Every structure is written in structure tokens, then in C-alpha cells.
Amino acid sequence: MLGKTQSQYIAYITDSLKWGGQVELNIMSSLFQVEIAAIDIQSGRIDTYGQGEQYSQRVYLLFTGIHFDAVVFDHSSGKRAVLPTDAKAKEAAQKLATSLQTQGKFTDQATMTLYCKVCGHVMKGDLEARTHAGASGHTEFAMKK
């Protein structure tokens, strides 16, 4: 998958320091027979995996620009992450995403400032970081605050 052999992909995706994206969200939607609505905090865009499959439940994720966080709703019957596919839950998840966007709780990978933990070189965005990694062999980066 994605340019890897099956064994390479399994090793990659089961590494606790790695995570998946669209492909894995599609797989999980099908496997668990639930819609997965991923809301991009920066843009407000919602990508819904499993849409049109007639699933009766939905899970909401917030995409920070770096990773996904599950949305858990606190109901009188307890905390729940899996909800009916109704407009009320969608509206609440969108409201949360809008609040986080207003607070700047997302990372813009194109404009974030990074530094190389090996040599200290400062870069703007993930493209410059990949270019630096290719030229120097350095692969340890951190966000500059």
C-alpha cells in the first residue's frame, strides 16, 4: 500500500510514532461500519468516510494539521464518541472546531517554523524541512515556538 510492500506497511502503521490518514479512515469506517467525519480545524472542511453506506452511527475527529483527535460528547448517560448520524451532533462538532480555529489551535504545515535538532537550521514549512532532510540526511525536527 502507498508504495510499500504489505510487510513494510504493517511495520509502518503499527509504529506508535506514526499514524494514518485518509486510507486508514476509510478502512476503519468499513471495518467498524460507522461514518467517520474528520473536521479540519483550520479550514472547517468536513470529510466524511463511509458516507452513503447507510451507517446509522458516526464518529467525529478533529484534524489539527498534524494529527486527529476524537470528539467525545458528554451526555447525561455518560461520555460517548459514537453517535447517531444526526444534524445535532454535527452542529456541536462544527461549533467546537470553530472555537478551536478562533483560538489558533491548529498547525499550518505550510507555514510552521521548524528547526533541525541536529544542526539548528531554521525552516519554514514541511517542504523546507523535507528539502533539508534530503540534502543533509538530518531527520529530527521540532516546531519553533
Descriptions of predicted regions:
Residues E24-T111, H121-E128:
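Deubiquitinase catalytic domains
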Residues M1-G3, V34-D40, F141-K144:
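Short loop-to-beta-strand transition segments
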Residues M1-G21, I27:
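Interface signal in eukaryotic adaptor modules for cytoskeleton, membrane trafficking
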Residues T111-M112, G125-K145:
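C-terminal recognition-helix end and immediately following basic linker
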Residues M1-Q8, I41-T48, T131-S136:
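Short amphipathic alpha-helical segments embedded in low-complexity Lys/Glu-rich regions
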Residues Y12, L31, H132:
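Residues that form generic nucleotide/phosphate-binding pockets
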Residues K117-C119:
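Short Cys/His-rich metal-coordination motifs, predominantly Zn2+-binding knuckles/fingers
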